[in-house]
């Protein structure tokens, strides 16, 4: 039994492989309990603050439903609902909320903000996404891989294909090296992954048996993979010039049925943290079609809707893994 009580959850860098496995085992057990109606509430009487400086569907719903299932109360502070960083510093906000709440979730911008909250709050702080990292997503991804593959994580070959400089590339690489995986980032040279983070992850890999490969060669990068993973190419709010240059660079890296075939693995799976631009059924999808003539972006519609895609199992597992983080760090054992 691991005692993670009162620990912050800011990045998987802070946890050992055994601790990460504990989160995953607890999430599995909580998922089973929810399905069988045998869940025991370990967060009764707890109050949780959810700070969202960026919009969210899965993360917000996962925290709210997970907390409710476990008997906790939540307060949602949206992009206009708190003064953090505008009228009040992160340190002051942390000291105020830490007096009223038992745990604080933060989804927003720089990693330094969530770290400041954790330093000053005096209660567990959980990272719901920053510009640099997305650790709760990785727990959901790894639980999903466990469910779909009859082998341990350290035997999984995993390729992240697309924008090698974004927070998902960072977060997946950290998680993968901790768990001893064969991890590849397949991305154009013009969009490099953070060199200091790559060096740090290679250091960790030397101790866990993991492998880290950064390549712009798609065929080489996806060969033999169990999982192909991608994320959106551009973020909302980025200027048109960035969209144009990124789309040009990344179009050859769209994950599709042909790329799945290139793995040579009939059991390969496709994953995506969502939302995904795979059709024209959204306002953004329509805009992309009008401006760039593309009906799909980072993943083909065919693959997204195919038997290889496990994206909705992955999305559901956001809730079970986030619940596990709250229970492990805040719950009555």
From Swiss-Prot:
Broad class of enzyme this protein falls into: transferase
BP terms from Gene Ontology: arginine biosynthetic process via ornithine; arginine catabolic process to ornithine; citrulline biosynthetic process
Domain of life, per lineage: Bacteria
UniProt KW keywords: Arginine metabolism, Cytoplasm, Transferase
Catalyses which reaction(s): carbamoyl phosphate + L-ornithine = L-citrulline + phosphate + H(+)
Primary location class: cytoplasm
EC number(s) stated in the UniProt entry for this protein: 2.1.3.3
PANTHER family: ORNITHINE CARBAMOYLTRANSFERASE (PTHR45753:SF2), ORNITHINE CARBAMOYLTRANSFERASE, MITOCHONDRIAL (PTHR45753)
Alphabetical list of Pfam families matching this protein: OTCace (PF00185), OTCace_N (PF02729)
InterPro entries hit by this protein: Asp/Orn_carbamoyltranf_P-bd, Asp/Orn_carbamoylTrfase, Asp/Orn_carbamoylTrfase_sf, Asp_carbamoyltransf_Asp/Orn-bd, Orn/put_carbamltrans, OTCase_ArgI
Listed name of the protein: Ornithine carbamoyltransferase
Pathway: Amino-acid degradation; L-arginine degradation via ADI pathway; carbamoyl phosphate from L-arginine: step 2/2
One cellular component (GO) term of this entry: cytoplasm
Gene name per UniProt: arcB
Gene Ontology MF term list: amino acid binding; ornithine carbamoyltransferase activity
């Amino acid at each position: 039994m691991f005692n993670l009580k009162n620990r912050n959850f800011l990045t998987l860098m802070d946890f050992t492989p055994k601790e990460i496995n504990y989160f995953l085992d607890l999430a599995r057990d909580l998922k089973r309990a929810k399905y069988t109606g045998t869940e025991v509430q370990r967060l009764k009487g707890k109050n949780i603050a959810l700070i969202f400086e960026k919009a969210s569907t899965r993360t917000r719903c996962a925290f709210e439903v997970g907390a409710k299932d476990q008997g906790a109360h939540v307060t949602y502070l949206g992009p206009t609902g708190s003064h953090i960083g505008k009228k009040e510093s992160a340190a002051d906000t942390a000291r105020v909320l830490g007096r009223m709440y038992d745990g604080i979730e933060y989804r927003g911008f720089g990693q330094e903000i969530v770290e400041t909250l954790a330093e000053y709050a005096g209660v567990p702080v959980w990272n719901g996404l920053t510009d640099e990292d997305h650790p709760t997503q990785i727990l959901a991804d790894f639980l999903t891989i466990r469910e779909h593959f009859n082998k341990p994580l350290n035997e999984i070959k995993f390729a992240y294909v697309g924008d090698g400089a974004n927070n998902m590339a960072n977060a997946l690489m950290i998680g993968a090296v901790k768990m001893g995986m064969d991890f590849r980032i397949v991305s154009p040279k013009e969009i490099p992954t953070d060199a200091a983070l790559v060096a740090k992850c290679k250091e960790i890999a030397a101790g866990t048996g993991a492998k880290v490969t950064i390549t712009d060669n798609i065929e080489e990068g996806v060969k033999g993979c169990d999982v192909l993973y991608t994320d959106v190419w551009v973020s909302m709010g980025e200027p048109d010039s960035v969209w144009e240059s990124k789309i040009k660079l990344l179009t050859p890296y769209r994950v599709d049925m042909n790329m799945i075939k290139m793995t040579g693995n009939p059991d390969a799976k496709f994953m995506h943290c969502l939302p995904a631009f795979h059709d024209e059924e959204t306002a953004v999808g329509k805009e992309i079609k009008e401006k760039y003539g593309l009906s799909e972006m980072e993943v083909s519609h065919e693959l997204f809707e195919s038997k290889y895609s496990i994206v909705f199992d992955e999305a559901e597992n956001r809730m079970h893994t986030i619940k596990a983080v709250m229970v492990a760090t805040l719950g009555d054992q």
